[in-house]
């Protein structure tokens, strides 16, 4: 057998299939922004999903990949198994080969067998390999038995074992409906020194027989009623775990013993000064998933993907704490990770500083919570009798001490202690469901559009073109005709309208037919078709009608200008802040642009101004903006920037160059020269997540309008100051200082007023049932001063009941305040007094037993209010005496 490094095995796999005519396709991002059904990329086929569904076409019919994957959160979640088994990971690489109609079962099996057993390839012993097939898939069974010549005793049929027809470990399906088919799994026998029985038997969960490759044969389309319709072009999707095959070829039984993990575990041991194998494995696994997730744009947060990332980071930190690590250590593992991952970590290397900063910040924020929470959990477990931690205590640890429930559960599991999930389920519902809710992404391909629909886009060169209506959709239903005032989606065979993509909004305009005019308010992509969304303003529109499609030129020009400005912005940011700046999102609107990018701190005002200066310099240079079609390799050699999570599958990519300043891969529309932009102005810079900043900017006429508004504002303020604007800032500062002086004098006057009012009120105190009582009126006193008066009198007298009625002499409204010292609240309460007064005189209010308020009381006779107050107090005291 081969004994290559993991990096060499990865390349060997890709080289093998490349020699067999497969296109090597780069790994997609761990976050698929084009597939709302996925929390994370969890298999090699994810980036080809639309191809299998018939919504996308590639220029190649077979491909091979080494796909980075995450399984932590959502349907596929291996997180809690990491550290307790030899083969589960949160992050792993899936090697795969794919056929989109180029070949099927026989060729796929022959290719797999050649790679696994060929002398110049993996050279595995044939007698160590077992295979499984779906129970009724005789075709696959016979290929293994008659063409590959595997002994029949090592070919295992697996039937339906999940409670319904075609629900089996050996029958793959994308969903309840859609593409599906049988699969054949290949197992490696590690030898009888390990526990485990052959696949298909009760003992298959041991470590002796390990699945190393799954060959999926997508040959049916499952209907709503469960019937299977054969596909015209069956496909192949295979997946081999790189870490698993590396363990086989490096002659080890655990994935954590392969070269990559051995080096990472050593690095973890170095930074934690520990040798605890289980925790070292957990941390080594988690640094891979966390670093690559941050690199792909995920940041720790309280929901969605960010919550899952936070979960993984904190689990790693907790294991570090168990090893004795008290200082931040996790971020220090990014550098050794980059070293061991080789070319797979090229992007991560470019963003190393940012990734380290995000991980370090999260670790430092969590450290205090962890130490306090773990101490309290230890106290609880020490006193625990039995083997179950009750749910109320688990919730208290979270609510009071901030210890996440998943850490409580993890720690308890290590001690064979169960957590009463039913006990804390209701109280923890929101927190516990965050990751789960994040994974409930809607599964909605636009199935109403035929997968054969296709629109040719002419809008790079034309804003007006002729076309034919090929489809109409009204209320999600295909129709033959639409009429006046109906809102619909129109599909044309040719269109100049740009469909929303790449952050650029869709075009608007008009589609004119002989008998109708359709107002387009937006344009979106539906697979290979472009849908024109809008309303029929006149007449009718039918399938087959010849039409003239005309884009709103003013709006398109504004959008194009802002798109070009976005490219200038990214290059300026990378020039000023560093190459770690990577686009994390964008919105190109006709009135403004928005650009999200990776950067670990807020930009200084001087930096924002410098970015504006750089961009406006390029605008004044009036650089030519041009596009070229070339291979991806050629574009990369030119230094073209690509969108982080976008896959460029065409043999030719579109490269947009702005003079010598910017080169990017882009499919959007753009200005002809930078001078068309006119002016660039940043309206805001803010943080939207840890390590992610957002800039919003305006250009051209909108920027000029903003400058005019600011200029007018300065002019108006200057006129108020009777100033020419030359020293306006000094004038404003002088005014601020003057205001502060006046406020200080005002506070002094208020203090004097309070003292005077207290002196007057103190002479009005009477006794009622042996208790000091003050009932009095005030005029035009602010509520805050009333509260201050009450507090001061309570402090001076020690035991007193105070009710003050303040009348506003302008509107006649009366505000009341009642105060009772602590020693009297068992006899009379401020809130009871106010409640009774509101019932009598109206108004609104409330409070506590020691202080309460009422406002908006309208009365013509304040003396009546005061008289009634005295009666209330007397009654309350009498009632309290009778009760005692």
Curated annotation (Swiss-Prot):
| GO molecular function annotations of the record | alanine-tRNA ligase activity; aminoacyl-tRNA deacylase activity; ATP binding; tRNA binding; zinc ion binding
Instruction: State its cofactor.
Output: Zn(2+)
- Designated name of the protein: Alanine--tRNA ligase
> GO biological process: any one?
negative regulation of DNA-templated transcription
Q: How is the cofactor bound?
A: Binds 1 zinc ion per subunit.
- Listed GO CC annotations: cytosol
> Which cellular compartments is it found in?
Cytoplasm
Q: Which domain of life is it from?
A: Bacteria
Any idea of its EC number? 6.1.1.7
- Top-tier EC class: ligase
Q: Which residues bind Zn(2+)?
A: 563, 567, 666, 670
Family recorded in the similarity comment:
Belongs to the class-II aminoacyl-tRNA synthetase family.
Q: What is the stated purpose of this protein? A: Catalyzes the attachment of alanine to tRNA(Ala) in a two-step reaction: alanine is first activated by ATP to form Ala-AMP and then transferred to the acceptor end of tRNA(Ala). Also edits incorrectly charged Ser-tRNA(Ala) and Gly-tRNA(Ala) via its editing domain.
Q: Can you state which reaction this protein catalyses?
A: tRNA(Ala) + L-alanine + ATP = L-alanyl-tRNA(Ala) + AMP + diphosphate
Domains as described in the record = Consists of three domains; the N-terminal catalytic domain, the editing domain and the C-terminal C-Ala domain. The editing domain removes incorrectly charged amino acids, while the C-Ala domain, along with tRNA(Ala), serves as a bridge to cooperatively bring together the editing and aminoacylation centers thus stimulating deacylation of misacylated tRNAs.
- InterPro entries, alphabetically? aa-tRNA-synth_II/BPL/LPL, Ala-tRNA-lgiase_IIc, Ala-tRNA-ligase_IIc_anticod-bd, Ala-tRNA-synth_IIc_core, Ala-tRNA-synth_IIc_N, Ala-tRNA_ligase, Ala_tRNA_ligase_euk/bac, DHHA1_dom
State the UniProt keywords alphabetically.
Aminoacyl-tRNA synthetase, ATP-binding, Cytoplasm, Ligase, Metal-binding, Nucleotide-binding, Protein biosynthesis, RNA-binding, tRNA-binding, Zinc
